[in-house]
């Protein structure tokens, strides 16, 4: 395991998931703004892309992350993560098993897991080859249609487990409800629309990051 990546993960607070913004054509500019605001990890998550277009978009994300010292995450695809030398591969509960992802990627990249219940979070915290996990969706969100909300109680249950690995709350989190997530015990968050739909992505990211850092230091 790359210890530098592990340390960067441990210090990360704000994780952004974005699509390729093909309808706006501003992916590079958007990423520069969000990363300047304090985003630590960027995951490209765009189910509309074929592999070639995803690789092209990831080149843009890679360059932006390198400019700002952020981690690049790939969703689901170990082969694509390998192709772009991603820092992070994020796997859902029904995606490629971790042992197979490690066989493709080796030890360097970080691997994350999605969970929607404290019991699954506890299992991910113990799973060999996993470096972090997410719990959610905290609130129902259009980015996960049909997925029932785990709720703040589930975030609190995970926090009470005192996981050994870094973990993030995810799902419907924004400036208006972040304080509830922090009160439940989370100290890291994954956001989508809170930044992707913001009029000022840099300012939105900066405010979220400020509150996450303050909570972690308290």
UniProtKB/Swiss-Prot annotation:
Pfam families: TMP-TENI. Binds 1 Mg(2+) ion per subunit. Mg(2+) binds at residues 76, 95. This is Thiamine-phosphate synthase. InterPro entries: Aldolase_TIM (IPR013785), ThiamineP_synth_sf (IPR036206), ThiamineP_synth_TenI (IPR022998), TMP_synthase (IPR034291). It catalyses: 2-[(2R,5Z)-2-carboxy-4-methylthiazol-5(2H)-ylidene]ethyl phosphate + 4-amino-2-methyl-5-(diphosphooxymethyl)pyrimidine + 2 H(+) = thiamine phosphate + CO2 + diphosphate; 2-(2-carboxy-4-methylthiazol-5-yl)ethyl phosphate + 4-amino-2-methyl-5-(diphosphooxymethyl)pyrimidine + 2 H(+) = thiamine phosphate + CO2 + diphosphate; 4-methyl-5-(2-phosphooxyethyl)-thiazole + 4-amino-2-methyl-5-(diphosphooxymethyl)pyrimidine + H(+) = thiamine phosphate + diphosphate. GO terms for molecular function: magnesium ion binding; thiamine-phosphate diphosphorylase activity. Its EC number is 2.5.1.3. Its cofactor is Mg(2+). The keyword Cell division does not apply. Condenses 4-methyl-5-(beta-hydroxyethyl)thiazole monophosphate (THZ-P) and 2-methyl-4-amino-5-hydroxymethyl pyrimidine pyrophosphate (HMP-PP) to form thiamine monophosphate (TMP).
């Amino acid at each position: 395991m790359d210890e530098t990546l592990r340390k960067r993960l441990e210090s990360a607070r704000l994780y952004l998931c974005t699509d390729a913004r093909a309808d706006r054509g501003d992916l590079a500019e958007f990423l520069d703004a969000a990363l300047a605001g304090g985003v630590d990890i960027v995951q490209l998550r765009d189910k509309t892309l074929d592999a070639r277009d995803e690789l092209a978009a990831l080149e843009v994300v890679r360059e932006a992350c390198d400019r700002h010292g952020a981690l690049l995450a790939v969703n689901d695809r170990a082969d694509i993560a390998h192709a772009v030398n991603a820092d992070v591969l994020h796997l859902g509960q029904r995606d490629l098993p971790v042992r197979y992802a490690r066989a493709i990627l080796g030890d360097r990249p970080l691997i994350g897991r999605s969970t929607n219940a404290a019991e699954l979070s506890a299992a991910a915290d113990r799973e060999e080859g996993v470096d972090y996990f997410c719990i959610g969706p905290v609130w129902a969100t259009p980015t996960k249609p049909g997925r029932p909300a785990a709720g703040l109680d589930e975030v609190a249950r995970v926090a009470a487990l005192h996981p050994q690995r870094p973990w993030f709350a995810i799902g419907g989190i924004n400036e208006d409800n972040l304080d509830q997530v922090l009160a439940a015990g989370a100290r890291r968050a994954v956001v989508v629309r809170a930044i992707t739909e913001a009029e000022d992505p840099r300012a939105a990211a900066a405010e979220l990051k400020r509150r996450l850092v303050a909570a972690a230091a308290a």
